[in-house]
Amino acid sequence: AFIPRQRRQGFQFWKALGCTHDYNNSFYYSDEDVRLRWEGYDAIAQTREAQRYIRERAAGRPFTLFLSWGPPHAPYHTAPEKYRSRFRPDALAVRPNVPESDRQKAREVLAGYYAHIAALDDCLGDLLATLSEKGIAKNTILVFTSDHGDMLYSHGRQKKQQPWDESIRVPFLLRYPAALGPGGRTIDMPISTPDIMPTLLGLCGIEVPETVEGTDFSRVVKGESPAPDNAALICCPSPFGQWTRKAGGREYRGVRTERYTYVRDLDGPWLLYDNLADPYQLTNLVNRPEHARLQKQLEGLLKAKLTQTGDDFRSGWDYIRQWGYEVDDSGT
């Protein structure tokens, strides 16, 4: 829908996409309440607009640009042909936790998923090239991340919202040569989406307001402090869409530490995985006597996280009624 200028949270350049997942026929709104359409594959068209903004407006003054691509979200087989032709299903490996009965379907989906990713690889490369062209690549913070993963038939499951790693783990790449140097390194520490904004403020030398949720990890990123033993809060407030209650969807809260995943639903403890010993999460250790002490520790960590965020963990229907949402039969 059209978003008037006064509700755009300060953004001055605006081309907001309507969420259709029809990547070759998608629309957006700009400064007028007129529906416009992206030409061709929308991720490429959106990248070209971002490049145009950088060339025309960004050089010589600070800017923030937020570019949100739709792919590699389903539907999977809609990337341009030059990318789809690069991936043959029978040549692709699937994860060991994909059931044998789903392996061929998983390979077919992966071929399209990888094609979308290959297209985005080129788009990201084009953005970096434009930053270099304008002479601002070294002094620009670039973050590449995502809002969710995709089960892709691991554990016989599909799509998002679910507490397994294929769904909750997402890439987080941060590039800032002026402060971090030209080389790369890996920080083995879980973070959550609320941590991104305060960390970016820290990297910019801007004080983080006390009201901001999340943690400033800029000193960790710069190598000035060791990575703490952090835990990311994971949750599904109310199942919907592609993970309905009829399909086994449920409310849950959990924590993902560097080593463990612990999740409870409204009925109690649900999942416990040792991701170091069991990276494909094939063995659920929840409620086993020999892991009672570990489970108690993780339960305490989860309760602390919920207290910190003011989450009383009720049925999703309670929140829907409380906030006056209207949902269809799928919970959407």
Language-model region placement:
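Long, internal low-complexity/basic segments
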Residues: 285-332
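Low-complexity, glycine/alanine/valine/leucine- and proline-rich hydrophobic stretches
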Residues: 247-269
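Short, acidic/polar N-cap/turn motifs at the starts of alpha helices
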Residues: 2, 25, 251-252
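Short, P/G- and charge-enriched loop/turn segments at secondary-structure junctions
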Residues: 157-162, 240-243, 248-251
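Short, structured coil segments at secondary-structure junctions
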Residues: 9-10, 168
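Basic phosphate/pyrophosphate-binding loop/patch that engages nucleotide-derived ligands
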Residues: 6, 58-59, 132, 220-230
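Active-site-proximal cap/lid insertion segments
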Residues: 17-44, 51-194, 202-211, 264, ...
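WW-domain-binding short linear motifs
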Residues: 228-235, 320
